[in-house]
């Protein structure tokens, strides 16, 4: 099993370090915070240059787990000290990471990653080896992704307990704009509209407002880094929301009828619940035949996951929705 | 203690019947569903005409607890059989109820009500005597509301375990548009935008999307009745949301910066949390001096509640926010 060098040991990076170690891999990390606590937990912490030199020497996979604004700086170091390493990341937005890799570490063998797991607490102290158990973990399969790099990164994600969702950088960013970044923007809009109603409105707020504004309590800096980093895709999602809300406004003003809006929303939520309640079918993809990356992307597009490998076969599960 | 006649014995009406009985009041009801179950639970169920005749004879307070589209029909019956009764309702939107009262039962002594309690299950089977414990319960105090009617309805709400929020019909409808109806519209828009992302997006949806779309799983007919019944106030709230979302769109497209949007939303949610964590100061309102209805409305405008009466004094609590 390939060794793992994790750069950035907050909630996600720390959990990758712990999970990969629990899977039996040799691990070490670099961090700008909590180094003593990581060491006290029994893990090797090196400064970034040394961590990357060791990655080159031991042919480790390097996992970038720093916030997006710090990614390019880490990539420069990788270009200097481990320029041909196997590389992935666990940063939310994928487009800017791909651009940074092309610019600063173009000779690495890269497949981007995004584990869909988290919790409200942050930092090393909140990290845990089981954070990814059962979670979806995107590993990007673009036209120019090397199949062996993709597979090795997918194996790391599976070792950490996750199921792997193969998709492109662009499709990932478009999807998370809709289901992760747009929810933050709409929660902020709703919270501001409610607060504009003054103490009377807040005193009457019940579950619908509480749920709809929950993520507005997240630290603004984190939300901004996430949303602004996915600017182009989020703009499309916001335009979609503006169009739908504008249609609701028009219907309310003209006929007073919100049926199309409310029923489309109900259908959307029912689709989510149906997806989550779906049965699972098994499928296998031969990684030696045809266009395996395209086959893998089709699994992701259908809401499926890669859950393991058997020789040259990738083992997949696909949701089976009731008719 | 005045007897209570509840018309409509679903979740809310059934819970009023149970709570008022538990407070020691004589109660009976009328219902189009579950009459056998209500009787089996030990309560008197009459047909609507007889229930209202008994209300007239025993000088009971009549509580309208039917869905908004059925309110006018009940009001006609009240005009026929108990035209001068003390009257309230527990329907969400207040404007259309006030209009119906003026048209069909203008001689009743009316103060509108809206208990801010509920749960996802509906119907008599879901009702419980403790549903309103600690909840806010709006009792409308308009310019033409009779103080003694307001007080008696408030006493019923307090007997049911709630704290009473005094405000006007118009201010109530504006507030619930922001904190109850707009959340449903935005949840519907978000759910539709997410589902438009297909199975890939649904497979990546985590907490922010799940929370933000939770109320989109409500029965569309109930949501439509609620939202469409509050058309004018909801239109204002939707316009506010459209303006804020449009501003976010413009900022994202021009500078890419969402700071104003995200920080205003964070401040709004912080205001909600601060309100809920606030300490409580006591206040008293002399119902025999000055303009007591205006004093009561000021309590509601400050996020306060009436929690009891002592002779001619109304006892209030007001939130005390940390500086």
Predicted features and spans:
Chain A
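Hydrophobic Val/Ile/Leu positions in short beta-strands of Rossmann-like dinucleotide-binding domains
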Residues: 5-6, 64, 139
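NAD(P)+-binding Rossmann beta1-loop-alpha1 motif at the extreme N-terminus of oxidoreductases
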Residues: 1-54
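Glycine-rich, N-terminal phosphate-binding loop of Rossmann-like dinucleotide-binding domains
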Residues: 65-67, 91, 141
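Interdomain hinge/lid region at the active-site interface
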Residues: 200-273
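Rossmann-like NAD(P)(H) cofactor-binding subdomain of soluble oxidoreductases
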Residues: 74-124
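Internal alpha-helical scaffold of NAD(P)-dependent oxidoreductase catalytic cores
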Residues: 131-217
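Rossmann-like NAD(P)-binding element
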Residues: 51-86
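NAD(P)-dependent dehydrogenase/reductase Rossmann-like domain
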Residues: 245, 252-254, 258-323
């Amino acid at each position: 099993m390939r060794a793992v060098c994790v750069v950035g040991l907050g909630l996600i990076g720390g959990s990758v370090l712990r999970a990969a170690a629990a899977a039996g891999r040799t691990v070490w990390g670099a961090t700008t915070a909590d180094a003593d606590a990581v060491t006290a937990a029994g893990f090797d912490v090196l400064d970034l240059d040394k961590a990357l030199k060791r990655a080159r020497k031991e042919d480790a996979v390097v996992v970038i787990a720093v916030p997006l604004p710090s990614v390019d700086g880490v990539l420069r170091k990788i270009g200097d000290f481990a320029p041909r390493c196997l590389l992935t990341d666990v940063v939310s937005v994928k487009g800017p990471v791909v651009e940074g890799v092309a610019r600063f570490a173009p000779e690495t063998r890269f497949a981007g990653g995004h584990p869909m797991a988290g919790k409200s607490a942050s930092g090393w102290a909140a990290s845990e080896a089981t954070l990814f158990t059962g979670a979806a973990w995107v590993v990007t399969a673009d036209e120019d992704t090397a199949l062996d790099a993709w597979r090795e990164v997918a194996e790391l994600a599976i070792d950490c307990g996750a199921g792997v969702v193969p998709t492109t950088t662009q499709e990932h960013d478009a999807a998370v704009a809709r289901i992760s970044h747009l929810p933050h923007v709409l929660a902020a809009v709703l919270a501001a509209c409610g607060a504009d109603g003054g103490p009377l409105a807040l005193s009457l707020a019940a579950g619908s407002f509480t749920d709809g504004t929950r993520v507005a309590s997240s630290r603004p800096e984190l939300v901004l880094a996430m949303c602004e980093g996915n600017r182009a895709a989020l703009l499309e999602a916001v335009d979609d929301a503006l169009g739908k809300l504008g249609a609701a406004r028009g219907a309310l003003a003209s006929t007073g009828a919100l049926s199309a809006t409310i029923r489309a929303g109900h259908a959307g939520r029912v689709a989510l619940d149906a997806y989550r309640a779906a049965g699972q079918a098994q499928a296998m993809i031969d990684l030696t035949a045809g266009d395996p990356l395209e086959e893998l992307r089709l699994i992701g597009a259908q809401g499926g996951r890669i859950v393991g490998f058997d020789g040259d076969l990738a083992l997949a599960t696909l949701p089976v929705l009731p008719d």
